A protein has these predicted regions:
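Conserved N-terminal phosphate-binding loop of PLP-dependent enzymes in the Aspartate aminotransferase
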Residues: 2-462
């Protein structure tokens, strides 16, 4: 049989593009899906085939593709100006966006530093927290605490506080070393969940009691450790972490890059436990999935420590060329307007309830270890033998098989190893959510129970 001719875009992709988190040897052996446009919760390829955007284009899309309000905001702004620097000038969209973010954020987060993506937002928080300690005379406070299985980005500072060895171990010699907590979401058996919760908090108490006067901040994802496979933290963990860090004057840096903007059912995941952190980072959904933008929110206490004369050298010397980009800020403002006008958060409880109900039959599938869910975020972990917890071998590529089979039925989902991920746009209807879950369930059943299926696939990691 003659080899199928790739489209021009696919040919150029294979010749010139290096994809993120992708083993390119495997990629170059495949015929890629070329997405030309989007409509609502659907992606549409160059042949006109429609796919549910089951992972919100890597957890960023909120209101669906081609939303008229967001489109119009970009058109209106481009007629004014695309970008002007925030170094020495004011940009109206960025000023208004910072105001609105503060109004939405947990109490006490009064200042906003804009950047470009989740990694930069955390990098800003790490540097601000460290510089603060130096400037107020707490020079011994140089250490950070991070969680095992945490993920905060790909820059060297964020990799330092990351806890996924597969991604980070090659850079070990370039990194600063944090104090590490066991994740409350990592356990061999669901029955061990409470034990994991208690052990993580006990270790935090020990670290703080022994080294608290040397620690700048604790960095964590609230409620869900996303890149580790949607590991859901037990209720009460975040609140207790906040209490302990406050007792020892350790900053809490909360990474809401994936969980922010209603993904968990509330506007910010912190709200579930009434927590106000010292730093909160936002990105992904901030522009509704339209453009790169990020924000690091912090307190007046932190901000005031950077005020002084030039000679005092208290300035925060950090920033990017496109910080506060007018187009990105304009569409972010439009996204917040859609949240208000379309009462997005009011519609979520019914959607989450339907999503939860639709997922219930998947729990009883032969090779499903656990279904982890928070709001419209779900991770379905697969095992070769659930009774003995025997894992699939990496080359079984069971998650990749599920993704390919789901794609054949019109759903784009990207697994993390053997964890099948769904994080659909908030704009999805109940019927669309139920259909996505149906496709995933059928694909899991086929991938795990049919012999000899798609044997040449390799694992997909994030």
């Amino acid at each position: 049989m003659a080899e199928k001719q790739l489209s021009q875009a696919a040919q150029w992709d294979h010749e010139f593009v290096w994809h993120p988190f992708t083993q390119m040897q495997d990629w170059l052996a495949q015929e890629p899906v070329v997405i030309e446009r989007g409509e609502g919760v659907f992606l549409i390829d160059e042949n006109g085939k429609k796919y549910y955007d089951g992972v919100s284009s890597l957890w960023v899309n909120i209101h669906g593709h081609n939303h008229p309000v967001l489109n119009q905001a970009l058109k209106d702004q481009i007629d004014k100006i695309a970008h002007s620097t925030l170094l020495g000038l004011v940009s109206p969209p960025s000023a208004q966006l910072c105001k609105e973010l503060v109004e939405l954020a947990p109490e006490g987060l009064d200042k906003v530093f804009l950047s470009d993506d989740g990694s930069t937002a955390i990098e800003v928080a790490i540097k601000m927290a460290y510089q603060y300690r130096q400037q107020v005379g707490q020079t011994k406070k140089t250490k950070f605490i991070a969680l095992n299985a945490g993920y905060h980005g790909d820059t060297l500072g964020t990799v330092s506080v990351g806890g996924i060895q597969l991604f980070h171990q090659v850079f070990h010699n370039l990194l600063f070393k944090p104090l590490t907590l066991p994740s409350p979401g990592v356990y061999a058996d669901v029955a061990d969940r409470d034990k994991a919760f208690e052990e993580s908090l006990a270790e935090l108490e020990r670290i703080l009691s022994e080294e608290g006067d040397e620690i700048t901040a604790l960095v964590m994802e609230p409620l869900v450790q996303a890149a580790a496979g949607m590991l859901v933290m037990p209720h009460g963990y975040l609140k207790r972490v906040r209490e302990l860090t406050e007792e020892h004057d350790v900053f809490l840096i909360v990474d809401e890059v994936a969980t922010g903007f209603c993904r968990t059912g509330k506007f910010f995941a912190c709200e579930h436990e009434g927590v106000s952190p010292d730093f909160m980072t936002l990105s992904k959904g901030i522009t509704g999935g339209y453009m790169p933008l990020a924000a690091t929110l912090t307190t007046k206490r932190v901000f005031d420590a950077f005020l002084g004369t030039f000679e005092e050298k208290k300035t925060f010397y950090h920033g990017h060329s496109y910080t506060g980009n007018a187009l990105a800020c304009a569409v972010a403002l439009a996204s917040l307007k859609v949240f208000r006008d379309e009462k997005v958060i009011d519609q979520l409880p019914a959607k989450v309830e339907a999503f939860t109900k639709a997922l219930e039959p998947i729990k009883s599938l032969k090779h499903v270890k656990e279904v982890r869910q928070r709001g419209l975020i779900v991770g379905i972990e697969l095992e070769k033998d659930v009774a003995t917890h025997e894992a699939y071998r990496p080359n079984d590529a069971v998650g990749a098989k599920v993704a390919i089979l789901a794609r054949e039925q019109g759903l784009i989902c990207r697994p993390i190893g053997d964890v099948v991920i769904l994080m659909p746009p908030l704009a999805s209807t109940v019927e669309q959510l139920e259909d996505m879950v149906r496709i995933v369930g059928e694909s899991i059943q086929r991938a795990t129970e049919e012999e000899g299926l798609l044997e040449d696939l390799r694992p997909i990691i994030l």
